[in-house]
């Protein structure tokens, strides 16, 4: 019997270590395990960072996981520009398709490449200040890394975006044609396995009234905006202070290193906030359970997973009135969208919701696209 010549697929994911980026890696890995029978004629080489664990009982022999010591942006660029090319040459590998799960492409001009794009900073129309400590990294991504990304793309690049604004931004920033971009939503079916969280709401009578804002401390997440809203509310409605003092706004930031905490302290607002530091997944779910209101004032997102999590728990959500928000939650009745920079509107909405809290039925959107479409593209372009 004639042996089958397998197609070799390179999958680069060395930068996917935390948060939503790691979720993409885990979803890809789990889907590949589930679909292994559909890819018997393929060999996958998955490159991830040292310390990232991928758990599976039966990893197919067609999947080779390669751990690499890539711990900073210099090591990452070195791997992607030089290291991968050297690795392929040493293995004498004929690659059918390059797959990037981390927005940047590959430096092989004549090869097909499938790029899962989820880094909003290089394509968002905003300038960052290199001299501001909390914007330096964003400036690097917006200027230097953006040029490297452009260098890594070729005429055979195909892009995956999660929401429409990213699709348009890819066209505007890198002059990519519409037929090179596919909008594919991430997998949210795993929430069905978390139904036990709904059965035990985790709240106790002794708990404060929680307002939850799960986000890292980047300027575009808008923590300072929330602090300003609270200050404005106290100034314009001082008679509401006794009620406000029974609430806590939860920031998932480290109180010892947070610049936002220093601002809160200067304004004497400490009693209204709870700083948890980094929380585990289960801890995050508990805070969703306990909270009566979820805030999402972020103005740069490639998807916005906390919106899904909040709707799953049937929570009232106050969010910026941006297109990606309504795209992620197209018909959730607990979503209230507020003009991004309208402080008065946010004050009014916050005050109304702490005076009258409402819960809703658990909700998950039914997206038309998903990982099946992504793996279909792997077959199509390999």
Predicted regions and their residues:
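Nucleotide-activated donor-binding/catalytic signature segment of Leloir-type glycosyltransferases, i.e.
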Residues: 259-282
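A conserved mid-protein helix/loop that constitutes part of the nucleotide-sugar donor-binding site
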Residues: 19-30, 218-235
């Amino acid at each position: 019997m004639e042996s089958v010549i397998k197609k070799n697929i390179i999958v680069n994911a060395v930068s996917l270590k935390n948060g939503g980026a790691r979720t993409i890696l885990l979803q890809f890995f789990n889907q590949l395990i589930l679909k292994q029978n559909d890819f018997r004629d393929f060999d996958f080489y998955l490159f991830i960072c040292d310390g990232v664990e991928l758990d599976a009982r039966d990893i197919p022999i067609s999947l080779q996981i390669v751990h690499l010591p890539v711990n900073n942006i210099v090591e990452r660029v070195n791997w992607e520009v030089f290291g991968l090319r050297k690795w392929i040459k040493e293995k004498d590998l004929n690659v059918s398709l390059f797959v990037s799960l981390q927005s940047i492409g590959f430096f092989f001009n004549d090869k097909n490449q499938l790029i899962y794009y989820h880094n909003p900073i290089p394509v968002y129309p905003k300038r960052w200040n290199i001299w501001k400590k909390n914007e330096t990294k964003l400036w690097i991504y917006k200027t230097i890394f953006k040029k490297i990304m452009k260098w890594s793309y070729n005429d055979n690049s195909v892009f995956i975006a999660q929401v429409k604004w990213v699709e348009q931004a890819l066209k505007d920033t890198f002059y990519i044609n519409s037929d090179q971009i596919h909008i594919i939503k991430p997998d949210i079916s795993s929430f069905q396995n978390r139904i036990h969280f709904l059965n035990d709401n985790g709240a106790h009578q002794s708990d404060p009234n929680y307002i939850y804002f799960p986000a890292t401390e980047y300027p575009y997440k808008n923590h300072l905006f929330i602090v300003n809203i609270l200050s404005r509310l106290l100034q314009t409605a001082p008679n509401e202070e006794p009620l406000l003092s029974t609430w806590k706004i939860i920031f998932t930031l480290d109180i010892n290193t947070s610049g936002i905490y220093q601002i809160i302290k200067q304004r004497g607002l400490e009693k209204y906030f709870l700083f948890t530091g980094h929380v585990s997944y289960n801890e995050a779910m508990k805070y969703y359970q306990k909270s009566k209101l979820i805030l999402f004032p972020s103005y740069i997102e490639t998807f916005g997973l906390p919106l899904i999590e909040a709707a799953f728990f049937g929570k009232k959500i106050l969010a910026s009135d941006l297109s990606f928000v309504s795209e992620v939650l197209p018909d959730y009745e607990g979503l209230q969208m507020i003009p991004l920079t309208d402080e008065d509107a946010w004050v009014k909405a916050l005050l109304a919701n702490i005076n009258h809290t409402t819960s809703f039925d658990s909700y998950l959107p039914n997206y038309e696209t998903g990982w099946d479409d992504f793996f279909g593209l792997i077959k199509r372009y390999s």
